[in-house]
UniProtKB/Swiss-Prot annotation:
The keyword Protein biosynthesis applies. The keyword S-adenosyl-L-methionine does not apply. HAMAP family: EF1_beta. The gene is ef1b. It comes from the Archaea. Keywords: Elongation factor, Protein biosynthesis. NCBIfam families: aEF-1_beta (TIGR00489), PRK00435.1 (NF001670). Promotes the exchange of GDP for GTP in EF-1-alpha/GDP, thus allowing the regeneration of EF-1-alpha/GTP that could then be used to form the ternary complex EF-1-alpha/GTP/AAtRNA. It comes from Methanoculleus marisnigri (strain ATCC 35101 / DSM 1498 / JR1). This is Elongation factor 1-beta. Gene3D superfamilies: 3.30.70.60. Belongs to the EF-1-beta/EF-1-delta family. GO terms for molecular function: translation elongation factor activity.
């Protein structure tokens, strides 16, 4: 079995959420390779996190669930995945 690289789009609850604190919380929750900011509108900025996980059943869902538990996160959605 190999690994799967996934891109997760993380939406904060509001524009007032501290993005740097949110990035730190994301890095603490899952093994992140990179985080990029994506402006949405009206001051809201989503984060896109690149995460590499083992290619096993449920691994991407575990990452998504861990990110949704972070305070200040409205949603976390896998938007892309590929084998590496």
């Amino acid at each position: 079995m190999g690994n799967v690289a996934i891109i997760v789009k993380i939406m904060p609850e509001s524009p007032e959420v501290d993005r740097e604190a949110l990035k730190a919380a994301v890095r603490a929750a899952v093994p992140v390779d990179d985080i990029q900011e994506e402006p949405i509108g009206f001051g809201l900025v989503a984060l896109k996190a690149a995460v590499v996980v083992p290619d096993k059943a449920g691994a991407p869902d575990e990452v998504e669930a861990a990110l949704q538990k972070i305070e200040g996160v409205a949603s976390a959605e896998i938007v892309e995945s590929t084998l590496v």
